C-alpha cells in the first residue's frame, strides 16, 4: 500500500528520479523556462522552490547545500547572484506551469514551467 507516500514515481527508480530532477532544476535555473510533461513539471516545483528559498540568504553553507542538489557551479552562482535577490520579497510561488497541448508521439500532456518575474528579453529564448 502506498498510504502517505508523497511524490510521483514516474516509472523510474530513485537514483534515476534524483538525477533527472537535478538536471531539470539546473536547466530551469539556466534557461528560466523549460518544456516538459505536466507530471514532471509538478514534481519539479518540489525541487526548485526550496532551492530558490535557500538562495535568498547567501552563505557558504547554503551554497554547498545548493551544489549538493545541482552539482553545477554556474547554476549555484546564478541562484545566489541573480535569483535569490530577484525573489527576496516573494514568499514562495516562484514558478508557473503553463499547459501547452500534447506531445505528438504519445499524446503526453506537455507544459512549460517557468520562473515568475522573468525578464521580458528572455521570453523569446525558448
From Swiss-Prot:
GO cellular component: cytosolic large ribosomal subunit
Keyword Ribonucleoprotein (UniProt): yes
Gene3D superfamilies attached to this UniProt entry: Ribosomal protein L17
Keywords recorded for this protein, A-Z: Ribonucleoprotein, Ribosomal protein
Entry's Gene Ontology molecular function annotations: structural constituent of ribosome
GO biological process: translation
InterPro entries (alphabetical): Ribosomal_bL17, Ribosomal_bL17_CS, Ribosomal_bL17_sf
Complexes and interactors: Part of the 50S ribosomal subunit. Contacts protein L32.
PANTHER family: LARGE RIBOSOMAL SUBUNIT PROTEIN BL17M (PTHR14413:SF16), RIBOSOMAL PROTEIN L17 (PTHR14413)
Annotated protein name in UniProt: Large ribosomal subunit protein bL17
Organism: Vibrio atlanticus (strain LGP32) (Vibrio splendidus (strain Mel32))
Gene encoding the protein: rplQ
Amino acid at each position: 500500500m502506498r498510504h502517505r507516500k508523497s511524490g510521483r514515481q514516474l516509472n523510474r527508480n530513485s537514483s534515476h528520479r534524483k538525477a533527472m530532477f537535478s538536471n531539470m532544476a539546473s536547466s530551469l535555473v539556466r534557461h528560466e523556462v523549460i518544456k516538459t510533461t505536466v507530471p514532471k513539471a509538478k514534481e519539479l516545483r518540489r525541487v526548485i522552490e526550496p532551492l530558490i528559498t535557500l538562495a535568498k540568504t547567501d552563505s557558504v553553507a547554503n551554497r554547498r547545500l545548493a551544489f549538493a542538489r545541482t552539482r553545477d557551479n554556474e547554476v549555484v552562482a546564478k541562484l545566489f547572484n541573480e535569483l535569490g535577490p530577484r525573489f527576496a520579497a516573494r514568499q514562495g510561488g516562484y514558478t508557473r506551469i503553463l499547459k501547452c497541448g500534447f506531445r505528438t508521439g504519445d499524446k503526453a500532456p506537455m507544459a512549460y514551467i517557468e520562473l515568475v518575474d522573468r525578464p521580458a528579453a528572455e521570453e523569446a529564448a525558448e
